[in-house]
């Protein structure tokens, strides 16, 4: 698998490429399956349909890896929190996690068992995915998941979380520890079900200043990485802490690949982290609106990363209104221009 070879710094015939959110709303085929499922969570829980949309970008675009179709918040959902997706406002937890009784009510054991639909999606996808294509599993980072659980949904300033961080840091650590233990078991079950690599998404890493991030954020990512690597040393682990270009000097851990978001100059990431880690990224997603912009973005990143271990990706998820033709063009151009 070219993607796995790249994760492990082995030579590849070209730079492998995939896109975050590649199974998504820009594809008419995805929208057709989602309409049949009824809503987003129903699609996540229907393993046959979830597998179908996981495979679509491989079949339609020719990406080098499929990424499991699911959501980072299925873990707190199956731990016992009430989650719904509201049109226009995203995920909402009807009873945010604010006290020890609510934390005690959440069950790690229940979550691992109740997420069987995810493992079934993985098994079915791996059966139908070409042998040379990797399947990436994933989870959210503990900090990012905790922000949703505590705030009750998305947030502009994370005021409730930060108040807790400064007023009751021990309780925030208790939440993060419990979420981390659930995620460790979840990722290990994904690997047993057949994923070839895993990615940890820390979408809201930039909400914390440097010292707080390494105490309440990255340290918990490394707990997951250490536990996974102890049991599955050959499974590549990708970390994607978004928006922390100022903290790169402090990044270390047993992971294999560091995902670079589009706001971080890839030259800076290369200087600080390569060749210790394979870099993944980091084209600005809106470049996909224009083939000329795609050409410029691809050329610049390939030129910067020439000779260094690299996986091509966007610096964040593909947007819902990107023309499919442009997404195809992007994938093909990366594969063509990076051919050794």
Swiss-Prot record:
Name of the top EC class for this enzyme: lyase
Molecular function terms, GO-annotated: uroporphyrinogen decarboxylase activity
Location(s) in or outside the cell: Cytoplasm
Entry's Gene Ontology BP terms: protoporphyrinogen IX biosynthetic process from glutamate
Signal peptide boundaries: none
Catalysis: reaction(s): uroporphyrinogen III + 4 H(+) = coproporphyrinogen III + 4 CO2
Binding site for substrate: 21-25, 71, 148, 203, 316
Record has Nucleotidyltransferase as a keyword: no
EC number assigned by the record: 4.1.1.37
GO cellular component, as recorded: cytosol
Main location: cytoplasm
Keyword annotations of the record: Cytoplasm, Decarboxylase, Lyase, Porphyrin biosynthesis
Metal-binding keyword on record: no
Membrane spanning residue stretches: none
Site (Transition state stabilizer): 71
Similarity comment: family membership: Belongs to the uroporphyrinogen decarboxylase family.
Protein name: Uroporphyrinogen decarboxylase
UniProt source species: Campylobacter concisus (strain 13826)
Organism taxonomic ancestry: Bacteria, Pseudomonadati, Campylobacterota, Epsilonproteobacteria, Campylobacterales
Gene name of the encoded protein: hemE
